[in-house]
Amino acid sequence: MTPTAPTAAPPRPPESGAPRRPDLRPQFFLGLEDSSLVATDTLLQIKDTVVDTVESRAMSVIYGDAGLGKSFGTRATIQEMNPDLILPLDFARSRPGPKDLREELFHQMNLSCKMPGTPTAFDKLLRETLPRRPYVIVCDEAQQYRRENFEFLRKLWDTCDPKPAVLFVGGREAYETLQSDPALASRIYIRLEILAMTEDEVLKAVPDSHPVWRGVDEALLKRVDTQYALGSFREWAKVTKHVIKGMEHLGADKVDDRVVDWALKRC
């Protein structure tokens, strides 16, 4: 059986006076109750990449199509690290610029000085501060980054000694931007492409991911994956939610073709 970990805990309110920190715990899509974190090959590959990058103080990229578990796996891995060393560059607005990155790093490190007023002074402060601790800069949704953001982080990484670890996590656009610039591409330590689950992986992982699928006939799992989910963790979460509602609606005590038909019509 594929090993599992406890379900993700609900978010906790921040302590009074604490610096603003995004909740970096892995969140199950749609808040699907009774879900379990499954140690799939994808999750283990992400863990190896993150740990190796952090230990090497390198820059790496984890990329692939949406819904395959890139962010979830990265968040699950960094939960085992000192949260004070994780610097997440998460933005509500799309297409952030270098100014946004500078200011977010300033806030995430909880610096007590006044925020510098010019890029030159700001970069000097960051070059002086980042080497003091083994920080890990996590750039999720990196496909939204402008090219100058990647260049800013590359120059910052180049000029820090010791260097921070930098993880780019995002869609293929992020990977393509990094690869299109020799100065950036030559500095990437690990390139990990995340692919959809194979049929064999689906048959192992899905029954362990949620109790509603335990004991379900393999042919039915294959049907759901072929007709809808296509190896995507996110799509499996959606169909699971609909299956649970379908069982309630139809008064069924197990997942069968009738429940699956009802669920797939809603997906």
What are these regions (language model features)?
Residues 55-60:
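Pre-Walker A (Motif I) flank of P-loop NTPase domains
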Residues 41-54:
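Pre-Walker A adenine-sensing motif
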